[in-house]
């Protein structure tokens, strides 16, 4: 699922097609002091695991990252349980054969397909992009991902769609080869939050943003410290120079 968020199908756009301006959300992670909502990150991972991971890989993430500071911050036990819920190919064994085993925290996220050709064949000729850094790879970033997820609607009467193509007002040409991935009730959040389409879109977008920028909170904290340091340094230099020049003026 989520196929072609990154590689939309530009199939003879209709003259009446107009790409709408992206939705703008007041994300908690934006701004100088922005930080991720832990609960949203954990829910976003659940959306990825139960909806997106059937088609999309996240090859740059390991399960242990889910327990690191600044991320979803699952407990060690939760991370182990999450990893163990996946089967990982390993080997060769003493007989030279490959085998499968339960995942470990050190393992990379398991890909839904064994190779690129298999993923293309399973998705009608389209390659479902890896989602590890998808937010950084798209103009508009988080707002783009959220808008596309929320952009499905009935097409205008005079708008032509080919078979296997869907109308999305936030795509260029308003056409996309990905069926609507989110709908209310498609999953049940473990924390009891109502899984509305809007809530799931925000949560998975937050999770994908963290995946693309896992050091965001550390960078923001460092930035604040640097600004405070520069303000103090500038103030110290100003008053030091003022005192030095006052002595020079007196001597003159």
Identify the residue ranges that each predicted region occupies.
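Hydrophobic secretory-pathway targeting helix
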Residues: 1-18
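Electrostatic cytochrome c docking/interface patches
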Residues: 21-46, 57-76, 192, 212, ...
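Acidic/histidine-rich catalytic neighborhood
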Residues: 31, 61-62, 68, 74-107
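Extracytoplasmic/secreted proteins, especially bacterial periplasmic and envelope-associated proteins
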Residues: 39, 43, 47, 130, ...
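The canonical Cys-X-X-Cys-His
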Residues: 48-59, 204
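Membrane-proximal low-complexity regions enriched in glycine and acidic/polar residues
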Residues: 87-173
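Extended, hydrophilic extramembrane loops/domains of integral membrane proteins
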Residues: 170-172, 178-213
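Juxtamembrane interface at the cytosolic side of transmembrane helices
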Residues: 219-224, 228-252
């Amino acid at each position: 699922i989520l196929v072609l968020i990154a590689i939309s199908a530009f199939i003879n756009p209709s003259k009446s097609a107009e790409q709408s301006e992206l939705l703008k959300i007041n994300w908690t992670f934006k701004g100088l002091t922005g930080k991720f909502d832990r609960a949203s990150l954990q829910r976003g991972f659940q959306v990825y695991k139960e909806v997106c991971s059937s088609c999309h890989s996240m090859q740059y993430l390991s399960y242990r990252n889910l327990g690191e500071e600044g991320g979803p911050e699952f407990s060690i036990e939760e991370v182990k349980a999450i990893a163990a819920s996946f089967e990982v190919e390993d080997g060769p064994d003493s007989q030279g054969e490959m085998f499968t085993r339960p995942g470990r925290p050190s393992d990379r996220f398991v890909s839904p397909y064994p190779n690129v050709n298999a993923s293309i064949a399973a998705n009608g000729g389209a390659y479902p992009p890896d989602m590890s850094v998808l937010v950084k790879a798209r103009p508009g970033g988080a707002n783009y991902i959220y808008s596309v997820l929320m952009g499905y609607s009935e097409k205008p009467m005079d708008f032509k769609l080919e078979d296997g193509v869907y109308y999305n007002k936030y795509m260029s040409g308003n056409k996309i080869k990905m069926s609507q991935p989110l709908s209310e009730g498609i999953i049940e959040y473990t924390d009891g939050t109502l899984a509305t389409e809007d809530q799931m879109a925000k949560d998975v977008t937050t999770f994908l943003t963290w995946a693309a920028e896992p050091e965001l909170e550390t960078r923001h904290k460092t930035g604040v410290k640097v600004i405070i340091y520069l303000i103090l340094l500038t103030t110290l230099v100003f008053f030091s120079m003022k005192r030095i020049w006052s002595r020079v003026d007196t001597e003159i």
